[in-house]
Amino acid sequence: MALRSYCRQLAAQVFRLKLCGNECPRNAPGCSFSLAGIKSLHEPTGVLARSSRCVKRWHRRSWHRCASLQMPSQKSHSDTTDFSRWTLAWGAVAFSLFGGSDEKTEEQKLEDELILLLKKAKYSMMIGELDAADGFLHRAVRLAHQMHNNDAIIYTYSLMANLAFVRGQLDNAEKLFKAAMSFMLSGGTPQDDNALIEMSLKLASIYATQNKNELAEHGFQFCTDSLEAKMDKQKDLPPESLSDEERKDTRLLLGLSLDARARYLAANHRFIGACRDYRHALQICQEEQGESHPQTLVLMSDLATVLDLRGKHDEALVYVKKAVELGQAAGHPEQHVLLGNMAGILMHNGEFEESAKLYQEALALAHTAGDAEAIEQLQEGLKELDNRRNAKDNSKVEDELKE
């Protein structure tokens, strides 16, 4: 339980990509769509709803959900909220464009049709009808090409790529992400644009899933190097030329990249590098989102897990205890995962009684939450705990007999 399987962890990458379906690269140039609408889709409002694309993803990842791959039918309240905002954004655009005219031009009719197809695709994804979503998106991308509209093409390719990844069609997802990036670059988007780096991170995650380690490592390195260089450049810019949101967006994307690489390194038993990246990601998340933010707590727990695997049980306990305490105070939605990780670390440290108590508490919470995968992991942890207890008792008996 102390360390989720790599498949379980990488499932979160898939889940995040599904969530990213709402987010086309914001900085794609050449918006001839007469729809500021495409770009308005990437600007949800509200507290945390976003200082950046990463904020939402860092909040929802609860990177044990790194754990459970949720299909679109398992939508959360925030998914529904995002969809409502998305629909309202399109509705406002359509009204402003077409509400004052009785007759529409051919171009406006095509725009209407494209908007409707994308709305249908998004709704189909949300309710889990992935085949239907795929059909709508293929029709939408053909229409976008017919209109020679780069923004619409990029947005639709991005949705198609995310959908392909959710469906496990990794080769197809790779091609679609590359196609979207190609259109962005040909339109003049700079290579250090956050949207391009975000797609590069998704590609690196695909390569990691496919065990294409050289490509994965190159991709992760490109993301972190590009973002760090960009942040260095931003330090020299006058304050008025860069908004707090842009600065935060870049920094949180770096945190997300470091976290993704840390999980990749941990899965390959490269724990020193994983600890380094987790510490840096945790620092960013604490500074940008606060000590009690759900993502901060998950990163504390993840770092503790890797420290535990390195044999640094005492340091691991410091981090995981803090995560559990803050999570309890904040009402963390996946407190059972934090408790399970702490139970595993205590078990490895030989504190069997306390470990058993936490495992049972975590198991009860997991049942309440209906987290079947966590329940399975926790039950495996309890079995391991029983085995360790029995082994210790047998060893004690043998020692007594020798005396």
Swiss-Prot record:
TPR repeats lie at residues 154-187, 297-330, 336-369. The keyword Membrane applies. It comes from the Eukaryota. GO terms for cellular component: mitochondrial inner membrane. InterPro entries: TPR-like_helical_dom_sf, TPR_rpt, TTC19. One of its GO terms (biological process) is mitochondrial respiratory chain complex III assembly. Residues 1-67 form a transit peptide. It is found in: Mitochondrion inner membrane. Pfam families: TPR_12 (PF13424), TPR_7 (PF13176). Keywords: Cell cycle, Cell division, Electron transport, Membrane, Mitochondrion, Mitochondrion inner membrane, Repeat, Respiratory chain, TPR repeat, Transit peptide, Transport. Binds to the mature mitochondrial complex III dimer, after the incorporation of the Rieske protein (UQCRFS1). Interacts with UQCRC1 and UQCRFS1. Interacts with ZFYVE26 and CHMP4B. Required for the preservation of the structural and functional integrity of mitochondrial respiratory complex III by allowing the physiological turnover of the Rieske protein UQCRFS1. Involved in the clearance of UQCRFS1 N-terminal fragments, which are produced upon incorporation into the complex III and whose presence is detrimental for its catalytic activity. Belongs to the TTC19 family. PANTHER family: TETRATRICOPEPTIDE REPEAT PROTEIN 19, TETRATRICOPEPTIDE REPEAT PROTEIN 19, MITOCHONDRIAL. This is Tetratricopeptide repeat protein 19, mitochondrial. It comes from Danio rerio. The lineage of its organism: Eukaryota, Metazoa, Chordata, Craniata, Vertebrata. The gene is ttc19.
